[in-house]
Each structure stands twice: as C-alpha cells, then as structure tokens.
UniProtKB/Swiss-Prot annotation:
Alphabetized Gene3D superfamilies for the sequence: Ribonucleotide Reductase, subunit A
Pfam family, one: Ribonuc_red_sm
Induction per the UniProt record: In response to DNA damage in a wild-type p53/TP53-dependent manner.
Catalytic reaction equation(s): a 2'-deoxyribonucleoside 5'-diphosphate + [thioredoxin]-disulfide + H2O = a ribonucleoside 5'-diphosphate + [thioredoxin]-dithiol
Localization: Cytoplasm; Nucleus
Free-text cofactor note: Binds 2 iron ions per subunit.
Annotated stretches, region: Disordered: 1-32
GO CC list: cytosol; mitochondrion; nucleoplasm; ribonucleoside-diphosphate reductase complex
Protein name stated in the entry: Ribonucleoside-diphosphate reductase subunit M2 B
The protein's enzyme class: oxidoreductase
EC number, as in UniProt: 1.17.4.1
Length: 351
C-alpha cells in the first residue's frame, strides 16, 4: 500500500482530476471553430479568416526594433528630473519590463497551443516577437537611466521586490495557470491586462511627452502603446468569433476587477501625483478605457466615464483604425499592407 501522504499518491488524484477537466475542456473546444483541431492548422492558404489575417499583416507592417529608438537625448532630461519623477518612471518601467514576459508566457503556454486557426497562430507568433522587443526596450531604458547596479537589479526583479507589481503579475499569472476557466474568460482577462493594466502607465508617459520630456522614452511609448492597442483589438476580434462566450456579468466582473487593481496601483501604490498628474482624473481615465474595452467586446459600459485627458484622444482603445491610419511617427513597414496584386513583378519596363 502506498503512503497517501507521499507526493506520488497525491499526484495520481491530481492527474485524475486534471484528466476530467481536460475531457470537459476538449468537448467545449470541439464546439469552437477557433479551437477545433484540424490538419488545416499547418497550412496558411487559402485564407479562411480575412479579418484575422489583416490584423496579422497590420502587426507585421508595424514591426520595429529597440535599436531604432534614439535614447541619446534622454539622459540630460533624466538628470534634471525631480527625485519623485525618477522614482515613478523607473518603477513604471520595472512593471512593464516584467509584464511583457507574462503576456508571452500566456501566448506560449496557452493561446498558441489552444487556437488551431493558422491566421490567428500567425498573429500570436508575431505578438510573441514584438512583446520580446517591448521587454528588451524597457530593459534598455532601465539600463540607460539607472547607473547603480543594485538599483538596477531591484528594478529588474520587480515581481519579487515590489508588492504592487507582484499583485498585478499574480492576477495575470493566475489566469495562465487556471485550468477550469474557459478560453473566452482568459481572452477577456488578457485583453484587460493589455488594455487596462497598461493604460494608465501609457498615459503617465504621454503626460511626460506633453511636457516635452524624455524623447526616446516617449517615442518608444508611442510604438509600444500602438502595438498593445492592436493586441487588445485582436483579443476582441477573437472574442467575437467564440460560440460559447462568457456572460456579460462574468466579463464585467473580470474587467472591473482589473480596473480596481490598476486604480490602486496608480493612485495609491505608485501615485501619478509623483509626476504632477491628478490621481482622481487617472482613476476616471482607467474607467473610460475599461468602458471602451467593454463596448469593443460587444457589451454596455459600466462606468459611463469621459476621457479626462485630451492628450490621450488618439491613444485610447478606440484606436483600432486610428492607430494604423495615423501611422504613429510614420512607423509602418513599406508595402506590407499592400494588396498582393499591387506587388506584381513584371519585365516589360523601359530601362
């Protein structure tokens, strides 16, 4: 007889429970076109989901690298900032540096394995790539501004060293580990991570741009917020394709939970007052962004909040077409968004 206290014995029960959960999950997956296994997943053409493919091409057209961001003018600005401003910016960067890795963990561990549609897999693959660029960019910014190795190490380990960053990270990580939640619930949760958890921090950095500070930081923020806007739009598109969507009540519960955590983060734990922003208006802005996300998911607003920051008009979640028609800082890869017929090669030109 095996000892019931031994890990192996406990593991069998856990495996059995896990197997039961997996069977239920597989039954639900077969009802979802996005999750249904098919040999079609190995071949991209012919395109079955043109709107999903179009978003993949938008992501591709917007590719950039950390080396393309000029940080040479930032240090003189950084050295003139007040201690509170330096504290706020460095801690925001620490949060961001950790967060992109968590988003990627979800894409690698869950979404890329669950979704069977090749067009969506292409998008997720490219999202993983650009999230790595974001993470590198934030790490490079910390490396550039923070000269003290101990402070730098503290910031790079934000999930362990900063309780308020850990709280946000734990919320996201819990969704990755949750084997009972539906795919739809997790799509909403990670739309909240990229649409709500990032929104206030993006706004804080755009506030610095309004003041004419830190051109390298604010330019990278434009590029990253544009990317995250597309990722959030993509999550909403995937949600629209689901047959078994979570209820409006459940979706609201997930998003309102994220709003509370983000409001606490930027008005209590790391208050935007440190850089001269109004904490009450920041709370309102986070509610405004959450309402926009709910509408894009196909539901009604919860907060009925107006956008209190005029400088964020083109950066809000409404940016689905705005972002890409505006072409932030003219950063779009040439010809990627052109129709295939526009790129025909011929030999009949006169030389």
């Amino acid at each position: 007889m095996g000892d019931p206290e031994r890990p192996e014995a406990a593991g069998l029960d856990q495996d059995e429970r896990s197997s039961s959960d997996t069977n239920e999950s597989e039954i639900k997956s077969n009802e979802e076109p996005l999750l249904r296994k098919s040999s079609r997943r190995f071949v991209i053409f012919p395109i079955q989901y043109p709107d999903i493919w179009k978003m993949y091409k938008q992501a591709q057209a917007s590719f950039w690298t950390a080396e393309e961001v000029d940080l040479s003018k930032d240090l003189p600005h950084w050295n003139k900032l007040k201690a509170d401003e330096k504290y706020f910016i460095s801690h925001i960067l620490a949060f961001f540096a950790a967060s992109d890795g968590i988003v990627n963990e979800n894409l690698v561990e869950r979404f890329s394995q669950e979704v069977q549609v090749p067009e969506a897999r292409c998008f997720y693959g490219f999202q993983i790539l650009i999230e790595n660029v974001h993470s590198e960019m934030y790490s490079l910014l910390i490396d550039t501004y923070i000269r003290d190795p101990k402070k730098r190490e503290f910031l790079f380990n934000a999930i362990e060293t900063m309780p308020y960053v850990k709280k946000k990270a734990d919320w996201a990580l819990r969704w990755i580990a949750d084997r009972k939640s539906t795919f739809g619930e997790r799509v909403v949760a990670f739309a909240a991570v990229e649409g709500v958890f990032f929104s206030g921090s993006f706004a804080a950095i755009f506030w610095l741009k309004k003041r004419g500070l830190m051109p390298g930081l604010t330019f990278s923020n434009e590029l990253i917020s544009r990317d995250e806007g597309l990722h959030c739009d993509f999550a909403c598109l995937m949600f629209q394709y689901l047959v078994n969507k979570p209820s409006e009540e459940r979706v609201r519960e997930i998003i309102v939970d994220a709003v509370k955590i983000e409001q606490e983060f930027l008005t209590e734990a790391l208050p935007v007052g440190l850089i001269g922003m109004n904490c009450i208006l920041m709370k309102q802005y986070i509610e405004f962004v959450a309402d926009r996300l709910l509408v894009e998911l196909g539901f009604s607003k919860v907060f009925q909040a107006e956008n209190p920051f005029d400088f964020m008009e083109n950066i809000s979640l409404e940016g689905k077409t705005n972002f890409f028609e505006k072409r932030v800082s003219e950063y779009q890869r040439f010809a990627v968004m052109a129709e295939t017929t526009d790129n025909v090669f011929t030999l009949d030109a006169d030389f």
